[in-house]
Amino acid sequence: PGSVPDYDREYLAEIDGARDFYMDTPLYSQLCYSNEKVQEKMIDSVVEYLLDHPEVDYLHFWLGDNYNNFCECEKCAQLSVSDWYVVLLNKLDERLTQKHISAKIVFLIYFELLWPPVQKQLKHPERFVMMFAPITRTYSKSFLGEKRVEGVKRALPKFRLNRLRFPSDLRENLEFLYANQDRFSGDAFDFDYHLMWEPFKDLAGVKLAEVIHDDVRALKDLGLNGMVSCQIQKAFMPHGLGIYAMGRTLENSDVDFDRLRKEYLSAAFGDHVSSVVNILQIFYDCHCPEYLRNEHSEIDARQAEAFDNGADRLREGAKQLRFLRKEESDKTVDLSLKLLAYYCELCAHYFLALGAKARGEAREKVREKFSEMHKFLFENESEYGNYLDSFYFDLMSEQILNSDWNNVLTA
């Protein structure tokens, strides 16, 4: 309270009887979308921007970020969240038409907006492009092979304002897509998060790259015409296979993943591919990405032992890579070996902390081992920070190590 001027407070969503920034963060704050002054201010801003930027062909028109943060006032309760969104979209379309602005408007289905509108419909769907953003999906599997069965519909979970949980299951996510496609048959694309948090869960990155490849191949069957990647920019450690697979498969969805893998690893590691593949396999021998995704039991003696063993093996792998560098004259290959050697050392520290967690050791012990990893990470950031997002590696590892294995987003 007090962070918002009183004369602006009426514009914010009312939650539990109060209107304020959600979690003290403007980005996470929804507005009172039934308020006509809010509607006009939002639409005026978009129109003004497009008049100033006639070069824009597609403009994204999103609501606030986060979830379970929509307005509970009496007027907003008259329509669903998605219906109020359609009201805004139709008003925006009308104003753009009046101004002879031809730009397409991208609307999103994300968190609460996954539930399709009930009472309202887009008046001119040709103005719009739909963006499917399955932020809570699992990346342990791909969409490949999933296809809508004509005539078969699964009921969506009941919408409960500000009391929602969101699915990790792929088919459940796709049911939301299909329900929205029943209401909107225009252009649509996938807005996905493969390279946002997942590089810090699938630490070797090879299986993740294959999921990316398969997801891109699946787009056509899902009625989606492309992909926008919401990701970190420094996604190149232990390698850049994930983003390479994404780009090449978007260019040609028929390309074989094994071919891409061999192309990339050969270009990056030259004659040392066999050794590198063996070292990357250590990660999968000693940790499963599903563990870091909270999809396995937190306390697991076998996984703890594997983490401890993996730490030793990764340190040996780092020694081997440094030895290979001694006679390597190719600068690209030398850099790739250097980055992988550092990454093995870093993950050896991480594995020791994860082993302590999997054994159920006291949080202080886990924290102590995390601190050693944290120190190693940031002591080397100036040298390796262009290739690895140190902030996100630190943040994600700390969250995983400190969590009680309860994902509040998903059912």
What are the language-model segments listed below?
Residues 1-262, 308, 315, 320, ...:
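Catalytic-core regions of glycoside hydrolase
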